[in-house]
Amino acid sequence: MRKIWFRSIASLVLCLMGLAGSRARAQEFPVQTKTLKNGMKVLVQSDHSIPNVALYIFYRNGSRNEHPGTTGLSHFFEHMMFNGAKKYGPGDLDKVMEANGGSNNAYTTRDTTVYQDWFPRLALPLIFDIEADRIANLRFDPQKIQSERGVVASERRLRTDNDNGGLLDEQLWATAFIAHPYQWPVVGWMSDIEHWTMEDLKHHFEMGYSPSNATMVVVGDVTPEEIFQLCGKYIEPITPHAPPPPVTTVEPEQLGERRLVVHKPAELPLLLMAYHGPKTNSPDFYALNILRTVLFQGQSSRMYKQLVDKEQIALEVSAFAEPAFDPTAEEIFVQPKQGVDPAVCEKVVYEELERAKSTAITDQELEKAKNIRLVEFYQQMRTISGRANTIGTYEVFFGDFNKLFDAAKNYAAVTKEDVQRAAKTYFGANNRTVATLIPENEQKAKQ
């Protein structure tokens, strides 16, 4: 069944790419929009295939909107928004959601905090009541705040301080960015986590989690009319606050390679690299995605074949770039084998990057990468949750959800020359930061 579905999707992608060449747009589905009086934008896409609903709220507030002393607050509110408000107390949100057959989650990035609800359509009024309560009446109970502060501190210790990959990644971003707030870790610095004040919390919440700073996306067994009516009843009466001040700091051009070395107890070394790249809403977005796919994605990628298959010096290699409002980092991850000097892996990475800059990729590589990207794109759109996240991501990061309908056309338009130009533009030696983790036992052996 899975193979049959994959073939059908692949055929659909090829068909859409052909249509894209004729300036047709990828499968459009109606999305109705409305901006509430308090500034929240609401997007609704009806899908009556199953009696379920996905409701996502995107707040344009992340670690980018913090400063020294308040780092980690956006992530902290990812936790606090589940810890009680005026009508629904601590733990009630999860209990009510589960009792009605639903579930919820949230995630925080450098640019956004996103809250996710999945539930049967019968629970629509209840979910709107819950969301309105925690937006308007979040509880700032000192005892609960102190308890959750401890939870976040423990999370930081687990995922960063005691995780070699997390620690090295934190050090990489703190070194690659010297001016822009992308240098802050999303979880926050431990000293800040320990010293946030009540005033810090209330100010950050009012600033970042106002309806005027949010976009709601609802996908599923709903009609736009009923969603707008529910918004009018539950969400629109909430008083908005001033949004976060604009981030005006521009990261200065990097004029030379930066390097850092971390020594930690570890079984394996680790190599990370960051090249300064563009923001998500950039003309180079699609060309960079194709380049990243050719070089790093899957066992048939250039880097995997060289590092893992041919040279047999690495266990894993990958690359990624997070959605970002401002120029961000193209990050490369290499897991060397035990006993392998990361510098050996580093040399191979540079050789492959230089090859991509000096010689255009092949026609076959280009078409394969386009197919991979489009299959991924349409797989995301299969479910109501994937569609809600994609619609919201395009609305928030590209400035218009309608741009998602141009994805097939934009991928089809990418040429080999575009990919080569992207490699030359962003993957220069002066534009990179290199972070290496050396196991302490190896360091002692060299001394």
Task: Go through the PLM ranges and name each one.
Residues Q45, I50-F76, P90-I135, N164-S191, ...:
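M16 family metallopeptidases and their MPP-like homologs
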Residues C15-V42, T223-H263, H276, D406-Q447:
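Proteolytic maturation boundary segments
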Residues N83-G84, Y88, I135-Q143, I361:
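Short, polar/flexible loop-turn hinges at active-site or ligand-entry regions and domain interfaces
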Residues Q27-K34, E155, W173-A214, P224, ...:
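Histidine-acidic residue clusters that define the catalytic metal-binding segment
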Residues R157, A174, P243-S300, N410:
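His/Glu-based metal-binding/catalytic segments typifying zinc-dependent metallopeptidases
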Residues L73-M81, L291:
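Active-site His/Glu-centered metal-binding helix of metallohydrolases
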Residues M1-L12, A20-S22:
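Bacterial N-terminal signal peptides that target proteins for export
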Residues I130, R134, E155, H204, ...:
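Generic, well-ordered alpha-helical scaffold segments in large soluble proteins
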